[in-house]
Design a protein with these regions (language model features):
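C-terminal extensions of enzymes
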Residues: 128, 136-188
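Short, solvent-exposed helix-helix connector turns and helix-capping sites enriched
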Residues: 1, 135-136
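Alpha/beta enzyme core
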Residues: 1-101, 109-130, 176-178
Length: 188
């Protein structure tokens, strides 16, 4: 109501000059990493990396890390999944900076696979939101507990007692793709 709301949207970047910021902004080049480092001591991670060439450029231009992401499938829903992009990116980065991966990770087994394939960390989004929406803080805590337990069960079953012991020898590509509609999703 007008008693407590002005009716004016106030985004988190209110007060910042956002002129020229956008996906097609010609000023948005790899040099922005150096400009950002001039004004902050925070680590600069580049999100949205999906190919080896971009990950190599992120390293070259001084990024402190990258996030392999297709923004939950909303940005590039017909491209490869991020887990499919990960091996070439891990190879290009070659341990020089951390690699976080997100988009589509729902279970502890998903987290295990990403770590085994070379991710430094895995971002989880929607499961937290589902927990929050259903049960508030307790729901978020339960989601965290479930993901942790699933990861630990997978680690025990694989004989990997620590996160650092998880490696590529513990996952493999079965060499084929399961066609859409063959996973039971059509029943949902």
């Amino acid at each position: 109501c007008a008693a407590c709301h002005t009716g004016r949207a106030k985004p988190i970047f209110d007060g910042l000059n956002m002129q020229g910021v956008g996906l097609n902004n010609p000023a948005m080049t790899w040099d922005v990493i150096a400009r950002m480092k001039e004004v902050t001591d925070m680590k600069i991670f580049i999100k949205g990396i999906e190919v080896a060439a971009d990950s190599a450029l992120a390293v070259q231009y001084g990024a402190d890390g990258i996030v392999v992401s297709n923004h939950g499938g909303r940005a590039t829903e017909t491209d490869k999944g991020t887990i499919e992009c990960l091996p070439e990116i891990v190879s290009a980065v070659n341990g020089r900076i951390p690699i976080i991966i997100d988009s589509g990770f729902r279970r502890g087994t998903d987290v295990y696979k990403a770590l085994a394939m070379g991710a430094s960390a895995v971002g989880i989004g929607r499961p937290y939101c589902w927990g929050l929406g259903a049960f508030g803080q307790a729901g978020v805590e339960r989601v965290l507990d479930l993901l942790n337990r699933e990861l630990l069960i997978t680690m025990v079953g694989s004989g990997t007692p620590t996160i650092d012991s998880i490696g590529p020898d513990y996952v493999h590509d079965v060499g084929h793709r399961v066609p859409r509609g063959r996973l039971g999703r059509e029943l949902l």
